[in-house]
UniProtKB/Swiss-Prot annotation:
Pfam families tied to this protein: zf-C2H2
Principal cellular location given in the protein's record: cytoplasm
Amino acid composition bias (Low complexity), ranges on this chain: 234-248
Gene giving rise to this polypeptide: MIG3
Name the UniProt record assigns to this protein: Transcription corepressor MIG3
Region spans: Disordered: 33-52, 229-268, 345-375
UniProt-listed Gene3D superfamilies: Classic Zinc Finger
Biased composition, class Polar residues, residue ranges: 249-259
Function: DNA-binding transcriptional repressor involved in response to toxic agents such as ribonucleotide reductase inhibitor, hydroxyurea (HU).
One cellular component (GO) term of this entry: chromatin
Source organism of the structure: Saccharomyces cerevisiae (strain ATCC 204508 / S288c) (Baker's yeast)
GO biological process: cellular response to UV; DNA damage response; negative regulation of transcription by RNA polymerase II; regulation of transcription by RNA polymerase II; response to ethanol
Location of the protein in the cell: Cytoplasm; Nucleus
Keywords: Cytoplasm, DNA-binding, Metal-binding, Nucleus, Phosphoprotein, Repeat, Transcription, Transcription regulation, Zinc, Zinc-finger
Induction of synthesis: Down-regulated at low calcium levels.
Length: 394
């Protein structure tokens, strides 16, 4: 008891309320009663929280204990509020209106704001519904994501020409050598269907005509049948056209294309027959390019002989007379003089090799005698070709 008295305050004897057990004095009675519970062990203040068995002798201790229960609830509430805010936070975003093309429907949002992230999500989704959950927090529900692909309307050309074909050289040749053929009336006899006729940028070019024809060549067999129809005035123009076609072929050796047989529906066959022999020459001529092709093939063999070019064959003289009947043109041969045929320079594909070899073998059987031109004429022609003005220089 002496050690307890050493802890008493110095005015302990002057205080009116003293403890009966330890003689400690207090200024107030409730303080004395509270001190008495320490000796008896009484704990009248029990915790009111369900499931908590604790009790306390002092009321302030009970209040301090109750704060532990309330602080845990408040902490859980604060955590739940923080998680809700991190889901969708629309407090600082700018107001946004969606276009009809994005497929976004806004229901019951009012003055709530949508963040920019939701705009990008909504634009990449097919159907987006935004529901208002209060407190300016929106929930985005996406059903089926879809990707918007821009569609460019490209007009379809029924007969496109590959880009490897140089149209600049075609137009330049057509402008320098216009088509002035006397056989332009042949075009009126055939049906002209723009949907089925192959499209060519310029029909006056011998390069384009040579590429469209399946039996195209620089020098063809049928030129000898049209030499008498061309007339003397077309001799110089035919020379220039043949040299221009030769230059265009040499400057563009690999520019050629082929079309399927269905694209050449308006083509007709011209089948001239020679009475003096069994040889029949057939050549496919396009409707849109018949006049130009006939003009380009009227290179006279007499001029070729004077210039010293070509390989000549000995044949009976014939004279042609064209007659028009059901789109087939026959040639009646009449003996008039000596005529020579030039050598062929034919550029064919794999499917035409058999036909070319068959025709060459048949021609060699009918005329086995072949004479080559002298070397002087060849050298003279090379000099003339080199000295000629170039129309293709830039």
């Amino acid at each position: 008891m002496n050690y307890l008295r050493d802890r008493f305050p110095p005015d302990n004897d002057q205080r009116p309320f003293r403890c009966e057990i330890c003689s400690r004095g207090f200024h107030r009675l409730e303080h004395k009663k509270r001190h008495g519970r320490t000796h008896t062990g009484e704990k009248p203040h029990k915790c009111t929280v369900q499931g908590c068995p604790k009790s306390f002798s002092r009321s302030d201790e009970l209040k301090r204990h109750l704060r532990t229960h309330t602080k845990g609830v408040q902490r859980r509430r604060i955590k739940s509020k923080g998680s809700r805010k991190t889901v969708v936070n629309t407090a600082t975003a700018a107001p946004t209106t969606f276009n009809e093309n994005t497929g976004v429907s806004l229901t019951g949002i009012g003055q709530s704001k949508v963040p920019p992230i939701l705009i990008s999500v909504a634009q990449n989704c097919d159907d987006v519904n935004i529901r208002n959950t209060g407190n300016n927090n929106g929930i985005v529900e996406t059903q089926a994501p879809a990707i918007l692909v821009p569609v460019i309307n490209i007009p379809n050309d029924p007969h496109p020409i590959p880009s490897s074909l140089s149209t600049t050289s075609i137009t330049s040749i057509a402008s320098v050598y216009p088509s002035t053929s006397p056989f332009q009336y042949l075009k009126s006899g055939f049906p002209e269907d723009p949907a089925s006729t192959p499209y060519v940028h310029s029909s006056g070019s011998s390069l384009a005509l040579g590429e469209l024809s399946s039996n195209s060549s620089i020098f063809s067999k049928s030129r000898r049948n049209l030499a008498a129809m061309s007339g003397p005035d077309s001799l110089s123009s035919s020379k220039n056209q043949s040299s221009a076609s030769l230059l265009s072929q040499t400057s563009h050796p690999s520019k050629s294309f082929s079309r399927p047989p269905t694209d050449l529906s308006p083509l007709r066959r011209i089948m001239p027959s020679v009475n003096t022999g069994d040889m029949e020459i057939s050549r496919t001529v396009s409707v849109s390019s018949s006049s130009s092709s006939l003009t380009s093939v009227t290179y006279d063999d007499t001029a070729a002989k004077d210039m010293g070019m070509g390989i000549f064959f000995d044949r009976p003289p014939v004279t042609q007379k064209a007659c028009r009947s059901n789109h087939k043109y026959k040639v009646n041969a009449v003996s008039r003089g000596r005529q020579h045929e030039r050598a062929q320079f034919h550029i064919s594909g794999d499917d035409e090799d058999s036909n070319v070899h068959r025709q060459e073998s048949r021609a060699s059987n009918t005329s086995p005698n072949v004479s080559l031109p002298p070397i002087k004429s060849i050298l003279r022609q090379i000099d003339n070709f080199n000295s000629a003005p170039s129309y293709f220089s830039k």
